[in-house]
A protein has these predicted regions:
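Glycine-rich phosphate/adenosyl-contacting loop at the front of the ribokinase-like
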Residues: 1-66, 77, 238, 242-245
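Conserved phosphate-binding/catalytic region of the ribokinase-like
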Residues: 4, 205-250
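Hydrophobic anchor at the start of a short beta-strand
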Residues: 4, 63-66, 89, 164, ...
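A glycine-rich beta-to-alpha transition motif near the start of alpha/beta enzyme domains, typified by
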Residues: 40, 64-91
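Beta-strand->loop->alpha-helix junctions that form or flank phosphate-binding loops
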Residues: 68-73, 90-100, 216-222, 241
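Conserved phosphate-binding/catalytic loop of the ribokinase/pfkB sugar-kinase fold
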Residues: 90-95, 103-144, 148
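A short, aliphatic-rich alpha-helical micro-motif
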Residues: 134-135, 184, 212
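Conserved beta-alpha-beta core of the PfkB/ribokinase-like small-molecule kinase fold
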Residues: 139-208, 226-227
């Protein structure tokens, strides 16, 4: 079975439900001095982060995942969860005097969201090195983490001829034109959603066809409209109809 190295974040997601509408508590003409507090009787703490989410889904497919991430001193409960899933954590590094990345997400009855994100130890992702991995790596995934770490790990994959998927996600705005063009030149595959694809084209100043010509495949997800894969041809993948769609946040 092939080994997939996942460089990204591990995070706690605290999901809160506000049993009302934000619009009833925010006065538009007083927005310049906003001070609000929401009573949230429902709270769930989930295990998340880009690397954690990818590793979990690969475990459902019986794939071998190797996690590479930086975490804080509060990681113990997440560590136990990953151990139960038999996910390799040899390259999960604890950063002293730091907390694991965490998001605090409040959702109202209209599914509007207010989110606060603390990156914590995630910003130290450059402390890890792909050169330290002793296992054979068949494919790597560079997912959102600290900017310096993402650049470093993509460079290491390129130097070691490890094929990798560049999955910038919400980290895309961190990079300028030159940095994104370097990622595109180094990557084997690129995976983005439709909004990120537009942003990638704008900042890199490259068209979809030009980006695709530099990689083996460009994957664009489009939510309910399915996905598109651009390789030597365009492949359209329809979405699966859900009986009861749920909010995937966290």
């Amino acid at each position: 079975m092939k080994n997939i190295l996942i460089s990204g974040s591990l995070a706690y997601d605290s999901i809160m439900v506000f049993q009302d509408y934000f619009k009833n508590h925010i006065l538009p003409d007083q927005i310049h001095k906003l001070s609000v507090s929401f009573f949230v009787p429902e709270l769930k703490r989930n295990f998340g982060g880009t690397a954690g989410n990818i590793a979990y889904n690969l475990s459902l497919l019986n794939s071998n995942s190797i996690l590479m991430a930086t975490v804080g001193e509060d990681f113990s409960s997440y560590e136990k969860r990953l151990s139960k899933l038999d996910i390799v954590q040899d390259y999960v590094k604890e950063v002293t005097d730091s907390l694991t990345a965490q998001a605090y997400i409040t959702t109202d009855l209209d599914d509007n969201q207010i989110t606060a994100f603390h990156p914590g130890a995630m910003m130290e992702s450059h402390q890890n090195s792909i050169s330290s991995v002793t296992e054979k790596v068949d494919l790597a995934i560079i997912a959102p983490a600290g900017k310096e770490g993402m650049i470093k790990h993509a460079h290491e994959c390129s130097e070691k001829n490890i094929p990798f998927i560049f999955d910038p996600g919400q980290g895309l705005p961190m990079f300028d034109k030159n940095e994104l063009n370097t990622f595109i030149d180094q990557a084997t595959f690129i995976a983005v959603n439709d909004y990120e694809a537009e942003l990638l084209m704008k900042v890199s100043e490259l068209s979809i066809s030009k980006i695709q010509s530099k990689v083996e495949a460009l994957i664009i997800t489009k939510g309910a409209q399915g996905s598109e894969i651009y390789c030597d041809k365009k492949i359209t993948i329809p979405s699966i109809k859900a009986d009861s769609p749920v909010d995937p946040t966290g």
